[in-house]
Amino acid sequence: MRLHFTKMQGAGNDFVVLDATRAPLALSAADYRFLGDRRFGVGADQILVVERSTTPGVDFRYRIFNGGSGDEVEQCGNGARCFARFVRDNGLSQQVRVKVETVNSLIELHVEADGRVTVDMNQPIFEHALIPFDSAGLSARPHNGHGNGFELWPLQLPGASLPSVDVAVLSMGNPHAVQRVHDVDTAPVAEIGPRVETHARFPRHVNAGFMQVMSRREVRLRVFERGAGETLACGTGACAAVVAGIRLGWLDPEVDVQTRGGLLTIAWAGLGHPVLMTGPAQTVFTGDIDLPTTSVQ
């Protein structure tokens, strides 16, 4: 089977984008792993599938598959910006604002005049059962912020160089655990990231964020993504980090997030308001690829 694809990137988070608006795609997890493979396939953090929506008032369905595992996931912020540019650049929609549905939410995308894309990421989710996060038996850590019920939670990591880390827990349509670090360059992301990702307190696993606060309007961030490992940028991770920082009293309502792949701007007016993410989205190249009869396992 031959597929036409578009390779895109948003702040270094890279994607294979597939157009399924004209004909449905029936790909397996092994097929998505093959497309994401950087040696045998195209290479990408995630594979994005563009489908028409059957929901009234919604323009497209946005599906996301991890390039490493082939599993479908709930949300990807950097991918959402690339999704918006793809439908605009390929003539699928000429609307300034596009509404799309994911597996668990609706989001609105806006292509700015300068080519950047702003995504309305909806309101963050703090209820532990909905993240999901099991806090049974845990005692929240004291902190110097003003969380108003939003707390830091200790995670025990037996055998790690850091036997315990304190994390802020929330969902941006997908689960996040954010910890504050002194220096993201020296933070043990490769060691601690996978331990947090697969921690038993997160029954569906979690994206592990490492945030360095530079000022009330600027942070540096690294994210070990669920099912993908560390990526150059994570849009939902940037949103989660800023929301956590605001609720803990560390950050102002609009913050520049410096990732290894580029700059994202996150704005959140507080409880009851959506999170707005603005950043770049670019097409790298297009091509065609034959799926092997037996995809790389």
Swiss-Prot record:
InterPro entries: DAP_epimerase_DapF. It is found in: Cytoplasm. Substrate binds at N13, Q46, N66, G77, N78, N174, N207, E225, R226, G235, T236. GO terms for molecular function: diaminopimelate epimerase activity. The active site is at C76, C234. It catalyses: (2S,6S)-2,6-diaminopimelate = meso-2,6-diaminopimelate. The record marks H176, E225 as: Could be important to modulate the pK values of the two catalytic cysteine residues. The keyword Disulfide bond does not apply. It comes from the Bacteria. Keywords: Amino-acid biosynthesis, Cytoplasm, Isomerase, Lysine biosynthesis. It is an enzyme of class 5 (isomerase). Its EC number is 5.1.1.7. NCBIfam families: DapF. Belongs to the diaminopimelate epimerase family. Catalyzes the stereoinversion of LL-2,6-diaminopimelate (L,L-DAP) to meso-diaminopimelate (meso-DAP), a precursor of L-lysine and an essential component of the bacterial peptidoglycan. This is Diaminopimelate epimerase. The gene is dapF.
